[in-house]
Amino acid sequence: MLPDNLEILKEYVERGAKEYDIVLVGAGSAKGRRDHTIEVFESLGEVLFRGVRVKPGRPAMAAVINGKPVICLPGFPMSTAVTLWSLVYPLLRLLTGRAAEQTEMIKDAIGTLESRPAKLLVQHSSPAGIEEWLRVKTARVGDKLYAWALTSGASVLWALAESDAIAMLPPSALECEKETEINLWMTRKVDYDRRALFQGSDDPAIQLLVTPVRRRGADFASRTVGSMGGLAALSRGECHFAAAHLLDESTGGYNDVFIERFANGRKWNRVLVFYRTQGIIVARGNPKGIHNFADLCEKDVVFSNRQPGAGTRVLFDHLLREHGKPADEIKGYSQICTTHMEAANRVYTGLADATLGIKSAADALGLDFIPLTEEPYELVIPEEYMNHPGIVALLDSLHDAEWRAKVEEMGGYRWP
């Protein structure tokens, strides 16, 4: 670990190039005048390149100093990983006389178990002229193997830990439409016969079901797409089960009309998991003095909203109409979050004054909560998937004592 000092960096890099066959400079690239690494490289040797057209990993640079390769690794962990896989590992293979075709060396670097094709579950936009490394999750529904990109930030290691495979998109990829076939470098062995795919309404308690499901020898992968998005995906045959809490304004009931519409005559089974409390989430101490929905409409409040089609968004829009408040008069109405925790976190960090969400999200961040309503949260499962091992394990896990205890600790839930 060295201080950010030009002369000290020069001393150590020069010494390293004399004593070792290859030198790596960690976290040595930055934007602005404090990026000393390029000055060190230029003063001691020949710069080979500064920056690569790869995402993540763009800030990487390399030089030859005293006849030795010196590589600067980017500061963000995912960028560093890609640089190690695509540049450092092949270079080590070359220096040790074990060079091979570049793609094969990279596949070996990331620990590829096998290569296999898959179809994109959702459209993906790739930056022009940039080779993009995607961390993807996968599931098979029917005879189709689907893949979708996880969070792509260079600082996010969660996506790498959660992913099943790496997919490399060429610089020419640009807009990859849904169902585009991509090649996967599998980094995890997945038993697709026992993995179910969930798409639907977000709830932290549902995510906790993964553990008991896996204890029962199965698995499920999930995508948070909102209640409406989940039912739509189910109708297109793009998941094994969904979840919904959609308010029908005409009757005051939940889910019936929407499930009937999307099922279109097919038999879809409904499982009531729990009732949960929805309300207004505000900062601790309630500095804006919000006590009901009318206050939310009348006071100078910055709101954090949910995506169209989410059950919480349907509820919020209904309450706006009920109070005669136009959506365009709500500050932050267009600021979209896709999960309860994301929306609550905007309140926690001061980016918003309030959001509509579940009590457990407020409690998790120590925020204040004004309850408004209680709603049913239902799983929706087509009849043809009821014997799927992932679904069988899921339904059994709903009675898991440990999971139920955790849900009760979270707060804001009531069992049927």
What are these model-predicted stretches?
Residues 208-217, 294, 306-308, 312-335:
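Ligand-binding cleft/hinge of the Venus flytrap
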Residues 1-73, 77-82, 105-107, 208, ...:
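Helix-rich terminal scaffold detector
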Residues 243-261, 344-373:
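A ligand-binding cleft/hinge motif common to bilobed small-molecule-binding domains
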Residues 138, 143, 149-238, 257, ...:
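N-terminal hydrophobic or amphipathic helices and topogenic motifs
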